[in-house]
């Protein structure tokens, strides 16, 4: 006999960050790499709000404990990756949330990446200063 699912898994990506998210029904709080969310992001409230957006939108903020393992990139990219992963995990928990999450854009992988530096240029597009004489 199949057991009832006790947790929902979702993988999120943003820039070079990859987040593996577990939603556990009945718990509360967000734990990132073994630390509390506020501690992990160093008190940057905007990043905490980004992570909680899918939960707030679907009114499931206090219904799930969120445990995250995230690697790569910086704080902003990691927050975006976690948001993507949480949205995907919520979809597994409740299929009826798909329309709201899709409309808010939380299920779409943000494909923007850093443009590579080209030879003969100082950065990706910045050219060396031009001198007529």
Swiss-Prot record:
Region (Disordered): 114-133
Coiled-coil stretches: none
GO molecular function per UniProt: RNA binding; structural constituent of ribosome
SUPFAM superfamilies in the record: Ribosomal protein S5 domain 2-like
Regions of compositional bias (Basic residues) in chain numbering: 118-133
Domain of life: Bacteria
Pfam family, any one: Ribosomal_S9
NCBIfam families tied to this protein: PRK00132.1 (NF001099)
Protein name per the record: Small ribosomal subunit protein uS9
Organism (species): Fusobacterium nucleatum subsp. nucleatum (strain ATCC 25586 / DSM 15643 / BCRC 10681 / CIP 101130 / JCM 8532 / KCTC 2640 / LMG 13131 / VPI 4355)
Gene name linked to the record: rpsI
């Amino acid at each position: 006999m199949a057991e009832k699912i006790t947790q929902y898994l979702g993988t999120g990506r943003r820039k070079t960050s990859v987040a593996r998210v577990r939603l556990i029904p009945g718990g509360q709080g967000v734990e990132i790499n073994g630390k509390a969310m506020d501690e992990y992001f160093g008190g940057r409230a905007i990043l905490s709000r980004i992570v909680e957006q899918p939960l707030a939108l679907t009114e499931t903020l206090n219904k799930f404990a969120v445990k995250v393992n995230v690697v790569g990139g910086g704080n902003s990219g990691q927050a975006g990756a976690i948001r993507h992963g949480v949205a995907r995990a919520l979809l597994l928990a409740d299929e009826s949330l798909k329309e709201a999450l899709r409309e808010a854009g939380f299920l779409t992988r943000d494909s923007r990446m850093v443009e590579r530096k080209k030879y003969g240029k100082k950065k990706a597009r910045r050219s060396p200063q031009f001198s007529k004489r």
